[in-house]
């Protein structure tokens, strides 16, 4: 999901064993099963939600904590991006001129789910209505030149 969707996810949006997401950009409504897993990454949505529950101080899955500038505990999407950049730097991994962005997590997840669950599933998970958009989105990060 997009960073705006992630920062808007709430525990109260979880019912019937699904995380219900209304995508902010498109308005697309998807209900993701908590049993959804991505074996290559060793992740299961329900486990991730439980980890969030352990540290969140409010209804938001990703919480800044209750503070003066965030009375409900929400975090701004830019704050999420800044924390991602800090975590990326903390790894000590040396990247090229263009290190991966937070948004590229979405693209990578789409490609991995395409491999494990098929392109139609990836398209629905991404919330795309157009197959063309999904195909473009699932294209590899590094483009290569066509040699003539």
Predicted segment positions?
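Key DNA-contact positions within bacterial/archaeal DNA-binding proteins
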Residues: 4, 78, 132
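C-terminal catalytic core of Y-nucleophile DNA break-rejoin enzymes
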Residues: 26-50, 56-86
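Short, charged phosphate-coordinating catalytic segments
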Residues: 1-17
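Catalytic-site neighborhood detector that most strongly recognizes the C-terminal catalytic loop/helix
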Residues: 23-27, 119, 126-148
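Key DNA-contacting residues within the recognition helix of helix-turn-helix
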Residues: 7, 111, 134-135
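Helix N-cap/coil-helix junction residues
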Residues: 1, 93-95, 128
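Short hydrophobic/aromatic-rich beta-strand segments that constitute the beta-sheet cores
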Residues: 19-21
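Short, basic (Lys/Arg/His-rich) helix/loop patches that form interaction surfaces
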Residues: 81-124
